[in-house]
A protein has these predicted regions:
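Conserved Rossmann-fold cofactor-binding substructure of NAD(P)-dependent oxidoreductases
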Residues: 58-73, 80-83
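Short, conserved SAM-binding/catalytic segment
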Residues: 45-53
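C-terminal catalytic/substrate-binding lobe primarily of soluble NAD(P)-dependent oxidoreductases
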Residues: 3, 149-417
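ADP-ribose/adenylate-binding Rossmann-like module
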Residues: 83, 94-112
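Rossmann-fold NAD(P)-binding glycine/threonine-rich loop
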Residues: 106-127
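Conserved glycine-rich Rossmann-like NAD(P)H-binding loop of the short-chain dehydrogenase/reductase
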Residues: 28-41
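N-terminal Rossmann NAD(P)H-binding glycine-rich loop of SDR-like oxidoreductase domains
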Residues: 8-22
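Helix N-cap at the beta1-alpha1 junction of Rossmann-like dinucleotide-binding domains, i.e.
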Residues: 13, 38-41, 109
Length: 417
């Protein structure tokens, strides 16, 4: 087949950088073309990769001619620039026009729905487009497919994610996404059909791995309840719940997110505030007013005590970074041999000393790299259309892909009860 040219757009972003580094571990016959609006940020990454393997160049993805020239002849185009609600459209359109395969780790509902609307166009163009190929969505979708395969009938699917203390490594696109997840409309699947809830309102407790234990999580606006019904149309309920660790972060993000939703705080100013907090700066007064409102609500709902909040604020004020605990879990219920059965999968470890879940950038980047390996292993022309992970990435092939990009097998998942 010869050397395959792999194009990364938005390559300087933290998650995309991790995807590139982990993908290089698989050691195929690939030429890595790294593009970003600020290519100088890629110099160290290029030096860390095998000599001659990668090149870096400037690209404004909204420059149609420049984008077309960058992706011409690529075996795969990976979009790592967010927020996807603004970036996915032009890149997907360019890939369709050029006839080259596309892959992203989109976690926004609106851009996911737009991508799915392009399915017939992708079929007509003979182009595979793989969306939502990160940790959540992505890894979670594969875990669902794996668990559901043990059942004769799928009735309910619950997806859970919790992200630990990520200070110092969160970009503005991630903060934008987090604010949209924490407040606003939430598309989900209930009683056999799509419904609209309010994000973060409904809560539940679940037992998570990676040192998290029994954790309160909140219903969130995420792509899984939008895409999984395509594979499991007869399921009664498909829900996604998420949260942050330690719990006070939930109050901060929820309080600021509500202010954005109500129009009392501009999104840019809200992101500025959270970005300041994530880099151990004070932020703005308006942000703190809304954040404190969210923190007080945690006490009212029982998610945290006043003592816990005081301790959290005191430690955070002096720049203390809390032990990183990040985890994913899926729980699928239905019938097996005529009997009600629950099948679960969850990630077992996270934090320093781990590979897959060192932090969320590592989890998303490593999962993306594994999906890339699986996609590139397929013969050209195998499929065409827009696909979410549960539709094309067979679980065992994906797990082997994770191993090929360096993940120890015992970090991938365990079976929870």
């Amino acid at each position: 087949m010869g050397t395959q040219r792999i194009v990364f757009i938005g390559a300087a972003g933290e998650m995309c950088r991790l995807a590139i580094e982990r993908f290089a571990v698989a050691d195929g016959d690939w030429e890595l073309a790294l593009y970003d609006i600020r290519p100088e940020l890629l110099e160290q990454l290029v030096r860390r990769l095998p000599p001659g393997r990668a090149s870096a160049a400037r690209l404004d993805l909204y420059d149609r001619e420049g984008l077309r020239a960058a992706i011409e002849g690529a075996a795969l185009v990976v979009l790592g620039a967010g927020p996807y609600i603004r970036t996915a459209g032009p890149v997907m359109a360019a890939c369709l026009e050029a006839g080259v395969p596309y892959l992203d780790f989109d976690d926004d509902i609106e851009s996911t729905l737009h991508a799915l609307s392009l399915h017939e166009d992708a079929v007509a163009a003979g182009v595979p487009m793989y969306i939502g190929c990160g940790a959540s969505p992505g890894f979670t979708n594969v875990l669902v497919a794996d668990a559901a395969a043990e059942l004769d009938r799928v009735d309910n699917i619950d997806v859970y994610w919790v992200v630990g203390d990520e200070r110092g490594s969160i970009g503005r696109a991630v903060l934008d996404h987090m604010l949209r997840v924490a407040a606003g409309p939430c598309m989900t699947w209930e009683n056999g059909g799509p419904v609209l809830h309010q994000s973060w309102v409904e809560t539940r407790w679940t037992e998570l791995g990676a040192g998290l234990g029994l954790t309160m999580v909140h219903e969130t606006a995420h792509p899984e309840p939008v895409t999984l019904p395509r594979k499991y149309p007869d399921a009664k309920n498909i829900r996604c719940f998420g949260g942050l660790d330690p719990a006070p972060y939930n109050g901060i993000v929820r309080g600021v997110g509500l202010a954005v939703q109500k129009g009392t705080m501009p999104m840019v100013k809200a992101i500025d505030f959270l970005e300041a907090l994530m880099t151990n700066k004070f932020g703005n007064v308006q942000g703190w007013r809304n954040a404190l409102s969210g923190l007080r609500n945690l006490v009212r709902t029982g998610e945290a005590t006043r003592t816990e909040l005081i301790k959290f604020v005191a430690l955070a004020a002096v720049g203390h970074t809390f032990p990183h605990k990040t985890g994913l879990k899926v729980e699928v219920t239905g019938l097996r041999n005529g009997l009600p059965t629950t099948v679960s999968r969850r990630t077992p470890v996270s934090g320093p000393g781990t590979y897959l879940f060192t932090d969320m950038a590592a989890a998303t980047g490593t999962a993306c790299a594994a999906f890339m390996v699986v996609a590139l292993d397929e013969q050209p022309g195998t499929r065409a259309g827009v696909f979410t992970p549960e539709e094309w990435a067979e679980p065992e092939r994906f797990y082997k892909g994770l191993e090929r990009v360096g993940t120890p097998r015992d970090e991938i998942f365990d079976v929870s009860h």
